[in-house]
């Protein structure tokens, strides 16, 4: 049946159809090759926006640095990073005046966090620049490597396990004359394979000691590694994002904790809340502006866009903000918080992998690493790349570019939101002292501005004043990309508002479908996504029912588990037909075993195993959920798991789904090819780390898991815990005397071994 698409929209208000124009179906674009070019663009643009600043040289690293703070006031509409310190401080003061005690209280909350946070907070997060190996690693490995190197260089404060003590080590490491690190390297040898008698290349991984002098160490500690941002929809060009090393991360975490605490208390802040809570917060601001504008005033809203938010922000400005916010706090606290912006003022951007050259005639490929860009002959490059390299050369040191101004993407989202809100806060009548006034919403670089005034001239004047005020603190509202509308219709962080938020359903499209984890998780995630969209995104019952049928169809094709009585032939049909025929209660078979689908929109919240349990044959139940069955994964016994789903904008979200361990919740094995590469040592470290953590969690179930205070090690904690538990179990008669004696003996042996080591 052919459908004329326009018919679909006859009954749909225009604003609800907006979601159909979004580039959210199909695969998002990914980048290939190196991000070196994008990173050079970022560095060059950032310097261009601040070009009228003052140049200085960092005495420790020799890096040239540009400081645009308190630079010339802009005379045109070009984006610029010349923030004025006194203006920023005044904006902070007014923000505090409108919210008495806000900074004081947030500082107290943060101080508590600083004293309690454990160093394992830094293991969260994905790829992290590992300064010991000079490339990216999983966060946990990068942290373990850093601590290992610190300890071998005599820095041991981190052994307490508190993040603040680890940061003391970081500070001390920067004063040392040098650091000795262990790097991994590969040896290749040609050997004859005993089985096939062919020559094969054998790789072995060696570790070697290397000494970094103070300058080289500082450069690495201040380095942000760069990559290309993947899967960005609706953009023609890719852009670079940064990942900082372990020295910077802890300090950034505390600054963001403080800023988050402030944002939570600001009604104009779109962070740190999300989803429905965010919509409610925004709706309140709009309601306030609309009720106040009744009949006498006009009210207009700007859907705002800022030009290159990060590249015009400045760490020195953040330092000024922190200095003001913490002005009555103890010295140690002020110092800890001021380090992150200071490090960012001296940051270095690593240019990534470099360029790949191909010679068509000779079929040769060669890579020019970033380190060589400083002195390679430019005749090999095309025009645009040549310009980039020429511009960046004065800034290069060891394959990294000095980048003092600007804040790479996503580093201080909360703190920059505080800055944005402080300007929105100045829109109150008591500050504008005229007939117009404004309010709005800010979420990192995205904003919506609502201006009220008696007439159109007043609205224009209000917008102009807002625009100029922003310029004074390094925020550049884009006149080309922002648009103004009567209040009641605007967009903010991809939420569309029209007398209330309309569901932008297309954003959720990428998360529908089969995730590809395993049969059990995929079924559970699939129905949970549909359920969540019925709750949050206006997914109606008929559409949800259709989505469910499409999902089941997709699922059956993915896992080749068509119903046992179907005619479709796949490589699993023989086994599934056999199972179907010998099953008495066919309704009890899981869909992944060729059973019928019993889901409808009323029972999406029930895991499939539970839904069908009463209908299953007894022997089927026994095979499916028998803990002795070697295929039943008992890695997670918790009833809730987390899946990563990809909404269309923003980072991948974590979504909870019910997990029931059955023969279908298998975990695929790691690809073996990694075992022959230089990553192997790292993989083994990671598994070791994982095993220790899992073991530790077995001893401390989450209910009783109070993180050990003081400097007892993990092993000591586990031994003492084992002794306490054993005594309780023995006295209550749960274990026999012999078992109790054996446990005590094992504990003593472990302690003895530790003493010998």
Swiss-Prot record:
A motif (Nuclear localization signal) lies at residues 187-195, 203-216. Residues 249-256 are annotated as: Promoter-binding site. Residues 286-483 form the RdRp catalytic domain. Residues 55-64 have a biased composition (Polar residues). The keyword Manganese does not apply. One of its GO terms (cellular component) is host cell cytoplasm. One of its GO terms (biological process) is DNA-templated transcription. Residues 50-82 are annotated as: Disordered. Its main location: host cell. It is found in: Host nucleus; Host cytoplasm. GO terms for molecular function: nucleotide binding; RNA binding; RNA-directed RNA polymerase activity. Phosphorylated by host PRKCA. Disulfide bonds: none annotated. It is an enzyme of class 2 (transferase). It catalyses: RNA(n) + a ribonucleoside 5'-triphosphate = RNA(n+1) + diphosphate. It holds the Pfam family Flu_PB1. Keywords: Eukaryotic host gene expression shutoff by virus, Eukaryotic host transcription shutoff by virus, Host cytoplasm, Host gene expression shutoff by virus, Host nucleus, Host-virus interaction, Inhibition of host RNA polymerase II by virus, Nucleotide-binding, Nucleotidyltransferase, Phosphoprotein, RNA-directed RNA polymerase, Transferase, Viral RNA replication, Viral transcription. InterPro entries: RNA-dir_pol_NSvirus (IPR007099), RNA_pol_PB1_influenza (IPR001407). Belongs to the influenza viruses polymerase PB1 family. Influenza RNA polymerase is composed of three subunits: PB1, PB2 and PA. Interacts (via N-terminus) with PA (via C-terminus). Interacts (via C-terminus) with PB2 (via N-terminus); this interaction is essential for transcription initiation. This is RNA-directed RNA polymerase catalytic subunit.
């Amino acid at each position: 049946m052919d459908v004329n698409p326009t018919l679909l929209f006859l009954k749909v208000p225009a604003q609800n159809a907006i979601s159909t124009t979004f580039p959210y179906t199909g695969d998002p674009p990914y980048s290939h090759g190196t991000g070196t070019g994008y990173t050079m663009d970022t560095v060059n643009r950032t310097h261009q926006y601040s070009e009228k600043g003052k140049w200085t040289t960092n005495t420790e690293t020799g890096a040239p640095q540009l400081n645009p703070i308190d630079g010339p006031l802009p005379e045109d509409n070009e984006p610029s990073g010349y923030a004025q310190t006194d203006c920023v401080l005044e904006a902070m003061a007014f923000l505090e005046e409108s919210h008495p005690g806000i900074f004081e209280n947030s500082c107290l909350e943060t101080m508590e966090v600083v004293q309690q946070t454990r160093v394992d907070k830094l293991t969260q997060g994905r790829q992290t620049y590992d300064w010991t190996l000079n490339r990216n690693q999983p966060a946990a490995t990068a942290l373990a490597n850093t601590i290992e190197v610190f300890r071998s260089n005599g820095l041991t404060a981190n052994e307490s396990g508190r993040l603040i003590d680890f940061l003391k080590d970081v500070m001390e490491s920067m004063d040392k004359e040098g650091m000795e690190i262990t790097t991994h390297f590969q040896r290749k040898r040609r050997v004859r394979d005993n089985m096939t008698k062919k020559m094969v290349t054998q790789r072995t991984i060696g570790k070697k000691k290397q000494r970094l002098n103070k300058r080289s160490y500082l450069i690495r500690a201040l380095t942000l590694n760069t990559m290309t941002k993947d899967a960005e929809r609706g953009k023609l060009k890719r852009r670079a994002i940064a990942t900082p090393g372990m020295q910077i991360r802890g300090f950034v975490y505390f600054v963001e904790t403080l800023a988050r605490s402030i944002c939570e208390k600001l009604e104009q802040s779109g962070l740190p809340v999300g989803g429905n809570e965010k919509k409610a917060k925004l709706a309140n601001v709009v309601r306030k502006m609309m009720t106040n504008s009744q009949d006498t005033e006009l009210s207009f809203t700007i859907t705002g866009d800022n030009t290159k938010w990060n590249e015009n922000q400045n760490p020195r400005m953040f330092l000024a903000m922190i200095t003001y916010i913490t002005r009555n706090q103890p010295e140690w606290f002020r110092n800890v918080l001021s380090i992150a912006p200071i490090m960012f003022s001296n940051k270095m951007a690593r240019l990534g992998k470099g360029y790949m050259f191909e010679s068509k005639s000779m079929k040769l490929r060669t890579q020019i690493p970033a380190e060589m860009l400083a002195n390679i002959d430019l005749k090999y490059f095309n025009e645009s790349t040549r310009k980039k390299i020429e511009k960046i050369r004065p800034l290069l040191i060891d394959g990294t570019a000095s980048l003092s101004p600007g804040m790479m993407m996503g580093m201080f989202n909360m703190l920059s939101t505080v800055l944005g809100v402080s300007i929105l806060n100045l829109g109150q009548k008591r500050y504008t002292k005229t007939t117009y006034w404004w309010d709005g919403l800010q979420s990192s670089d995205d904003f919506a501005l609502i201006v009220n005034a008696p007439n159109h001239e007043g609205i224009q004047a209000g917008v102009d004043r807002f625009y100029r005020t922003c310029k004074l603190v390094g925020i550049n509202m884009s006149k080309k990309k922002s648009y103004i509308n009567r209040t009641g219709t605007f967009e903010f962080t991809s939420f569309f508002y029209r007398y209330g938020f309309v569901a932008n359903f297309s954003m959720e499209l990428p998360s529908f479908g089969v995730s590809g984890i395993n049969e059990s998780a995929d079924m559970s995630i699939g129905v949970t996504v549909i359920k969540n969209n019925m709750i949050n995104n206006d997914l109606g019952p008929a559409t949800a029912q259709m989505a469910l049928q499409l999902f089941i169809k997709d699922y059956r094709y993915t896992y080749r588990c068509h119903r046992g009585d179907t005619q479709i032939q796949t490589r699993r049909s023989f086994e599934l037909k056999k199972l179907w025929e010998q099953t008495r209660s066919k309704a009890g078979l899981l869909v992944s075993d060729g059973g019928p689908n019993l889901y409808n929109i009323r029972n999406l919240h029930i895991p499939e195993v539970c839904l069908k349990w009463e209908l299953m044959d007894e022997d089927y139940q026994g095979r499916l959920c028998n803990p002795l069955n070697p295929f039943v994964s008992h890695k997670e016994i918790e009833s809730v798991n987390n899946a990563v789903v990809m909404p269309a904008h923003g980072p991948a979200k974590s979504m909870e789904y019910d997990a029931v361990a059955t023969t279908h919740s298998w975990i695929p094995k790691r690809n073996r090819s990694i075992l022959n590469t230089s990553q192997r040592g790292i993989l083994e470290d990671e598994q070791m780390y994982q095993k220790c953590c899992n073991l530790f969690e077995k001893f401390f179930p989450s209910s009783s898991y109070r993180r050990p205070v003081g400097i007892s090690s993990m092993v000591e904690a586990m031994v003492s815990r084992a002794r306490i538990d054993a005594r309780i179990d023995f006295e209550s008669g749960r274990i026999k005397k012999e078992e109790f004696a054996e446990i005590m003996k094992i504990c003593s042996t472990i302690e003895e071994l530790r003493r010998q080591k």
